[in-house]
Amino acid sequence: AAAAAGKNLHEVSNIVQETCNRATMFGLIDTVDYLVKGGRLSKTAGLIGSLLNIKPIIVTRNGEVVQYAKTRSFTKSLRSIRSKLESDSDLEEIGIMYTTDPIIANEFADSISDLLPNGKKPYISQLGSALGAHMGPGGLGVGIITK
């Protein structure tokens, strides 16, 4: 939009950087198996996580990936993210990315669309293969941009 509005490369770059500074990405992981296969989690931690049916939620802010929460079901993970979004009164945009299941992405989008201003709807797209390989089947990404 900025380029179409006649902004030069430097101005567009500044707008992109400023938007990135307001962005947060959550990753809801349905199975820890692919974190182990990708070397992101030890085999021991993966075994324990699988046995206990742990569903980790990670968050990426300013290029740093950290654990946000651990739940015992994917439904609880979705509730945790909805609760976080409800506490953010300055939401501007929400994007939902899925690895293999667009139905879950669409259902979650419907359940949180009331949180965006002016009747906006969340963007929905399939996650790229690089991130999808680490998140595994059933993974869901939720990206937010705040004002």
Regions found by a protein language model. Name each.
Residues A1-K147:
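Mixed-charge interfacial surface used for oligomerization/domain docking
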